């Protein structure tokens, strides 16, 4: 049996307004499917698409738990509630640590991702986020399997006045040094 789509109903659309969203940074006039902003846990489980957990309803959480849909790929960006809320422009974004705790209690593993945006979620906020996520790796059940740190990608098609700063080579080196130092520290304690 072949199915037209992997999902039998429509894709769950993203209701966040992240200033760094790659969908919003594409040129106009391309095929419609390139402009679909999914935030669908089913696509995360099936294909490794990243989701934010802000768009899930009670039934979605229940299904993730009941069907043990694991691992999921989660866009974290910051564990600091105010910073994550600022980045996703969504009040529900501040609940990320409670949501990861719920995933842990339900034996769901994740791969985490942090998109580093200069002067927003770097420095001490980045360090706190990495260490917060590492706590979920140190336990007997490793909820957080990996944490990817990626630089914000900006195109010439992005909306004006998005408040983002492009990453220079020097800044990238500084972030790499910071993350490698944290990584070395965690490798000794995990």
For each predicted feature, which ranges?
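Membrane-inserting hydrophobic helices used for pore formation or membrane fusion
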Residues: 176, 185, 189-190
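Short helix-terminating capping/connector loops at secondary-structure junctions
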Residues: 139-144, 188-190
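Conserved Radical SAM active-site core
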Residues: 1-142, 153-174, 178-182
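Positively charged, polyanion-binding regions of nucleic-acid-associated proteins
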Residues: 150
């Amino acid at each position: 049996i072949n199915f037209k789509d992997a999902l039998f109903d429509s894709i769950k659309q993203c209701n966040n307004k992240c200033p760094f969203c790659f969908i919003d940074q594409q040129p106009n006039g391309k095929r419609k499917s390139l402009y679909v902003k999914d935030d669908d846990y089913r696509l995360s489980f099936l294909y490794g698409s990243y989701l934010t957990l802000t768009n899930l309803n009670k039934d979605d959480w229940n299904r993730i738990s009941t069907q043990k849909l694991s691992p999921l790929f989660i866009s974290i960006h910051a564990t600091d509630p105010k910073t994550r809320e600022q980045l996703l422009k969504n009040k529900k974004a501040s609940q990320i640590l409670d949501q990861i705790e719920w995933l842990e209690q339900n034996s769901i593993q994740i791969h985490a991702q942090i998109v580093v945006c200069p002067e927003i979620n770097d420095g001490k906020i980045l360090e706190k986020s990495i260490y917060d996520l590492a706590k979920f790796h140190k336990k007997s059940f490793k909820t957080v399997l990996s944490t990817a740190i990626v630089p914000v990608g900006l195109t010439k098609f992005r909306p004006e006045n998005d408040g983002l700063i492009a990453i220079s080579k020097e800044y990238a080196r500084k972030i790499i040094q910071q993350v490698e130092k944290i990584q070395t520290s965690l490798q000794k304690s995990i």
